[in-house]
């Protein structure tokens, strides 16, 4: 017999009762996200610094300010826009131009206040001439966006833009 064959029951027993589930004489930490919750502000600062320190970034070279985020970092709702426009680039906050006025009206229509929502963009610098972010730009910023979502850990994500 060159191979041991395990039936389904043996697989379950191996999975449930082998050494990886042996417990030591100490409590089990089931709250793995506590560290993230406690340090959310610090993690957001580090993420923003990472984005600000990007090198060889055409978007960064053409923009005035980083447009990182706005709103409640503890919100269960996160809005992700496509990219900042001219007004956002001037003020360094997402959705403060015409799109922001429309967003505020839409939120009010469903009894939500902007200050209770967390808002960011796919790319954090304004594309030249208010054009849509290109695929390569979106890919470059996607790792930062994933990290951003992980830090905020919303229950709902609303995507805006084209």
Question: Which positions does each model-derived feature cover?
Answer:
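Non-catalytic accessory regions outside enzyme or core folds
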Residues: 1-21
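A polyanion-binding, active-site-adjacent surface
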Residues: 15-162
């Amino acid at each position: 017999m060159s191979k041991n064959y395990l039936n389904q029951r043996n697989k379950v027993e191996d999975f449930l009762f082998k050494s990886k589930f042996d417990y030591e004489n100490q409590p089990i930490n089931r709250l793995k996200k506590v560290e993230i919750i406690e340090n959310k502000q610090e993690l957001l600062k580090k993420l923003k610094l990472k984005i600000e320190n990007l090198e060889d970034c055409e978007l960064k070279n053409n923009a005035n300010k980083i447009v990182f985020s706005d709103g409640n970092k503890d919100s269960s709702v996160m809005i992700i826009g496509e990219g900042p426009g001219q007004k956002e680039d001037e003020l360094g906050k997402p959705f403060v131009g015409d799109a922001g006025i429309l967003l505020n009206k839409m939120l009010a229509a469903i009894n939500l206040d902007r200050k209770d929502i967390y808002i960011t963009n796919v790319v954090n610098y304004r594309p030249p001439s208010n054009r849509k972010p290109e695929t390569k730009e979106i890919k470059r910023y996607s790792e930062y966006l994933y990290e951003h979502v992980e830090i905020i850990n919303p229950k709902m994500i609303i995507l805006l833009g084209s």
